[in-house]
């Protein structure tokens, strides 16, 4: 009997609802320097869909305020300029003005306690996201790191009418299959959009 080949995207992506994401963001103490930092980080994760490592490697030089863009070092050594939404920009500005400790370090986000240096990897960003979820009372995602906000953004965009192609471009998916996986959470939307997606409705 031939073995059954398991498709690598067979499982549904885990995501938070828009209301849950808002609850996580609202749970940040934006009156404290650490809270401002964490809020800005969570905004980048939830509004731009950045990966934990992409947030950790952002530097002060990567932000072009005049152009309203941010240079992101993406997976696979890709580099791309992303537009900064007003609410995301406001969160970053609030952190830089009233939250970021004085430091010669060029990383955008630094540790709250001395030494005020950047994070070595995305692990710290993942922990910040996990603590924020737990603080908001959102449990049951023990194995989900910061990536759950990326999944949530893609799912919300799909349900708001964005095409799979647009979502794939925003999240820099190399494979169409990666983006199609998000469509599984809404079969009705998948059927409506598949005709405009390469290889769809076969």
Give residue spans per PLM region.
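Conserved catalytic core of the tyrosine transesterase superfamily
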Residues: 1-202
């Amino acid at each position: 009997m031939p073995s059954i080949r398991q498709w690598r995207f067979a499982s549904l992506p885990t995501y938070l609802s828009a209301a849950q994401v808002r609850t996580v963001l609202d749970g940040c103490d934006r009156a404290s320097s650490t809270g401002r930092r964490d809020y800005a980080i969570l905004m980048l994760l939830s509004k731009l869909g950045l990966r934990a490592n992409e947030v950790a490697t952002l530097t002060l030089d990567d932000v072009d305020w005049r152009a309203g863009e941010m240079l992101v070092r993406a997976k696979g050594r890709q580099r791309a300029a992303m537009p900064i939404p007003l609410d995301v920009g406001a969160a970053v500005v609030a952190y830089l003005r009233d939250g970021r400790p004085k430091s010669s370090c060029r990383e955008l986000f630094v540790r709250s306690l001395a030494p005020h240096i950047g994070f070595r990897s995305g692990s710290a960003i993942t922990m910040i996201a996990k603590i924020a979820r737990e603080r908001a009372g959102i449990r049951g995602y023990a194995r989900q790191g910061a990536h759950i906000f990326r999944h949530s953004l893609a799912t919300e965009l799909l349900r708001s009418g964005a095409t799979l192609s647009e979502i794939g471009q925003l999240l820099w998916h190399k494979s169409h299959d990666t983006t199609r996986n998000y469509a599984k959470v809404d079969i009705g939307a998948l059927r409506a959009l598949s005709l405009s997606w390469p290889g769809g409705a076969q």
